[in-house]
Amino acid sequence: TLALTDVNGLWGFIRFVQHCRSSRINPIAGVNLINNKQEVLILVENQHGYENLCRIISNMHDDPNGDISDILRKYHAGVFVLGYDISILKELSSFIPDSHLFVELRPGFQESTIKSISEELKLEIVATGDVYFKNKTFHKTHMALRAIDCNSTLSDLNEFDYKSEDHWFRSEAEMVHLFPNSLHALNNSKYLADRCKT
């Protein structure tokens, strides 16, 4: 199973599904929803969730700096939502059941910080790769593409405009090495993937 979560869209999803099917990999639809205030990861649970994901993305494009919580309040059925920011997770927990809301542990975050958020909100942790490039050697290419997209030079890129070199595609063993104290979060990612039927 593999999820593609483009930023604010389903840009590569059709090709992703074609490649997954030809490789006998179960594809999961999703999106990394980001604006200048908030960020969440959304994974589709079922067909109704896919329809809601399309509505979420449309609403995000209609109002790019709108409140992600307001959009999800209307369209959270059939999707799983993962976040790492305690303020948006608190807000989302008022209307999304804990069976569909999770704390995201991703590269670059301290396991202890994520664990304390999980304990405070009584939400399970799910580990993700937050992948933006194939391996570490592609980080320079990522930086160059981000500079082009931002109409900037490499030296003038804002740190929020690119990902660190931690965001490469890891094997299961490499994920265990990255998060040695969070094996339950890695198991939860498998459990969540099994629940996604797109």
What are these model-predicted stretches?
Residues T1-T198:
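Phosphodiester-processing cores and adjacent nucleic acid-binding clamps
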